[in-house]
């Protein structure tokens, strides 16, 4: 039996974009947020748990840089680190997220402590960082292509949150506004790497699975938040109301 022919670049890009059907913008938790049905606790829980994702993104990108021998790719990819960590003397996305936390009524020190991060969220994010460390730099870079769908999710928050949640300080929306442009720029670079690297049908199918893996991570994070903040069944809820779960173990 002959091997299946590779998809053309246009067909491959179309297949990648079709994965947007599984993006977490469609998760009931996110739908509730942009439809105005989320409670203050649910929004605060989302902001607190997503902070763990935010602080780990630079570590993911640093792993890609460490594994990449191509200087030109590194020169462009390093901008992602600066976007989140900030350049010397400048704030980055992490500080912008802390301001979002303040805007929804969370203390920055509590966010930094990560005491509100649910185990399910921590496991999902850690799996993503570990994948980036162990995979080839091309596969790790391509896993970032959920950014294909990110501008829509940022815009949905900017469009709906001020209307539905007047108690949120509008200054907190800076992160979403900034990421609109950054995500579009990052998509161009990531898509170029992906379309150039995956040239056989088997490699293209593997890349689609990698993208699904990343979508699974984002969806699983919201599943954990749904259990805790919608169904009121956080970890160990049958035996205690205390947050007894681990707060991160250095390995």
Swiss-Prot record:
One of its GO terms (biological process) is sulfur compound metabolic process. Pathway: Cofactor biosynthesis; pyrroloquinoline quinone biosynthesis. Pfam families: TENA_THI-4. The keyword Protein biosynthesis does not apply. It catalyses: 6-(2-amino-2-carboxyethyl)-7,8-dioxo-1,2,3,4,7,8-hexahydroquinoline-2,4-dicarboxylate + 3 O2 = pyrroloquinoline quinone + 2 H2O2 + 2 H2O + H(+). Its EC number is 1.3.3.11. One of its GO terms (molecular function) is pyrroloquinoline-quinone synthase activity. Belongs to the PqqC family. This is Pyrroloquinoline-quinone synthase.
């Amino acid at each position: 039996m002959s091997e299946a022919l590779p998809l053309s670049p246009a067909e491959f890009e179309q297949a990648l974009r079709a994965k947007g059907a599984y993006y977490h913008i469609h998760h009931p938790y996110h739908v509730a947020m942009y439809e105005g049905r989320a409670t203050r606790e649910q929004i605060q829980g989302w902001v607190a748990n997503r902070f763990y994702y935010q602080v780990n993104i630079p570590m993911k990108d640093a792993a890609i840089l460490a594994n990449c021998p191509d200087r030109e790719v590194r020169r462009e990819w390093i901008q992602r680190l600066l976007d989140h960590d900030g350049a010397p003397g400048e704030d980055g996305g992490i500080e912008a997220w802390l301001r979002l936390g303040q805007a929804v009524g969370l203390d920055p020190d509590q966010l930094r402590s990560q005491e509100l991060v649910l185990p399910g969220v921590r496991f999902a994010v850690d799996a993503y960082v570990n994948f980036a460390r162990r995979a080839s730099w091309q596969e790790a870079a391509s896993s970032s292509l959920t950014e294909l769908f990110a501008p829509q999710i940022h815009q949905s928050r900017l469009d709906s949150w001020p209307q539905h949640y007047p108690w949120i300080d509008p200054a907190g929306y800076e992160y979403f506004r900034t990421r609109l442009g950054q995500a579009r720029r990052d998509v161009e670079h990531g898509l170029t790497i992906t379309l150039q690297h995956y040239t056989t049908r088997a490699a293209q199918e593997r890349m689609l699975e990698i993208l699904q893996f990343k979508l699974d991570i984002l969806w699983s994070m919201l599943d954990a938040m749904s259990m805790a903040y919608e169904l009121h069944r956080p970890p160990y809820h049958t035996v205690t109301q205390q947050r007894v779960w681990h707060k991160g173990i250095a390995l």
